Swiss-Prot record:
Protein name: Noelin-2
Keyword Mitochondrion on entry: no
Any coiled-coil regions, as ranges: 86-109, 160-218
GO cellular component, one term: cytoplasm
Olfactomedin-like domain ranges (all copies): 218-470
TM region(s), chain numbering: none
Signal peptide: 1-16
Annotated glycosylation sites: N33, N98, N179, N299, N334, N423, N465
Gene behind the chain: Olfm2
Family matches, as InterPro entries: Noelin_dom, Olfac-like_dom, Olfactomedin-like_domain
Intrachain S-S bonds: C219-C401
Subunit structure: Peripherally associated with AMPAR complex. AMPAR complex consists of an inner core made of 4 pore-forming GluA/GRIA proteins (GRIA1, GRIA2, GRIA3 and GRIA4) and 4 major auxiliary subunits arranged in a twofold symmetry. One of the two pairs of distinct binding sites is occupied either by CNIH2, CNIH3 or CACNG2, CACNG3. The other harbors CACNG2, CACNG3, CACNG4, CACNG8 or GSG1L. This inner core of AMPAR complex is complemented by outer core constituents binding directly to the GluA/GRIA proteins at sites distinct from the interaction sites of the inner core constituents.
Induction of expression: Expression in SMCs and carotid arteries is up-regulated upon injury or by PDGFB.
Function: Involved in transforming growth factor beta (TGF-beta)-induced smooth muscle differentiation. TGF-beta induces expression and nuclear translocation of OLFM2 where it binds to SRF, causing its dissociation from the transcriptional repressor HEY2/HERP1 and facilitating binding of SRF to target genes. Plays a role in AMPAR complex organization. Is a regulator of vascular smooth-muscle cell (SMC) phenotypic switching, that acts by promoting RUNX2 and inhibiting MYOCD binding to SRF.
Amino acid sequence: MSVPLLKIGAVLSTMAMVTNWMSQTLPSLVGLNSTVSRAGSSEKITLFQSPEEGWQLYTSAQAPDGKCICTAVIPAQSTCARDGRSRELRQLMEKVQNVSQSMEVLELRTYRDLQYVRSMETLMRSLDARLRTADGSVSAKSFQELKDRMTELLPLSSVLEQYKADTRTIVRLREEVRNLSGNLAAIQEEMGAYGYEDLQQRVMALEARLHACAQKLGCGKLTGVSNPITIRAMGSRFGSWMTDTMAPSADSRVWYMDGYYKGRRVLEFRTLGDFIKGQNFIQHLLPQPWAGTGHVVYNGSLFYNKYQSNVVVKYHFRSRSVLVQRSLPGAGYNNTFPYSWGGFSDMDFMVDESGLWAVYTTNQNAGNIVVSRLDPHTLEVVRSWDTGYPKRSAGEAFMICGVLYVTNSHLAGAKVYFAYFTNTSSYEYTDVPFHNQYSHISMLDYNPRERALYTWNNGHQVLYNVTLFHVISTAGDP
């Protein structure tokens, strides 16, 4: 290999190292890494003030999508105490940006010159090969050709000189970047020592107060029902589907029961996603058939009405056995006092924030809805209320925070029309509309864990989020 070719090889190797340094080492030198990014994100949360600095929770509500919202008053902030350091940090970042732009220019020029060097390398290899094969006698014509070729190589010297200049520039930029990196590290350390930990403590304190807020938001008066969210279209016109109201958040199993009478097959899907896809499920075969669609899953067990009886059955999924069954005194059954849509819906079981409930009717109550609180272990009636609302005029019903909400129809145009408050044994007429998308609701149940209404609507499994009205008193309130 000739000396010029060796020089070009050295230049190419040097430029490869420079390119690698620009793409890998430069970002870490200027501090453009995950640590700096986290610090920047932390600065955004300085709005959260600790209680002793004057902010306070003054309202709380629930968004239309069902999420808990707590509103806090933030005191007016004076000029940031770290303005000097912030300005210095911005100046340093501008310098880093300028350095980065200079490096981009060098990289572009290097790429252009590299293409030229590669073409010259091909020419020099051709000359080297001709010199090696030439004999002792070289004609004047051959000398002229060699001279012409060497003339073509003359511009290469200026390219190499430019490489030398670029190398010096890179060395200078690298030194500047090192200085900037040191300054950034010092600022980062100072802000981390005096700011980030304090911010983290404030955020933790705020999270604790928001958690307390969420606990207080557990109950409230129903003021709105969201638009329907169709999860799946599966099964016949009537049925029920549900999740366990007492399960931990990691347990997202879904139970599916198609039909409204004489059914025994219960499908258990591992997750809501599996339910949507119709996969990963097991089958439970109940020892006694069910009636209606008012079933509920509570703390690992299914509570349902035994077909052609007023018997409540508690079936445990894990042991696949009936733990207890008991007659509900005086309760009508076999389409004696169903909802307006029929379907053997004489007995409807519900769970809210306070426990297990049964909604039904007796002859003694003249067909009016009776609400009974049940002991989930023995199925004994703890207490009962006569709501005075005729069950055959109700489309469906559900419990939220000890309040029974009744719809006036199971068809299109239905709304939540009546509310009975068990804590005061009083009632009121309401006007809370909701969109009955598929025009025939045969199951409507509230899940307190998810604060959502589960609905079976004409063969569609549908969810509704609810809006609850809350009145929250803070520690400073009289």
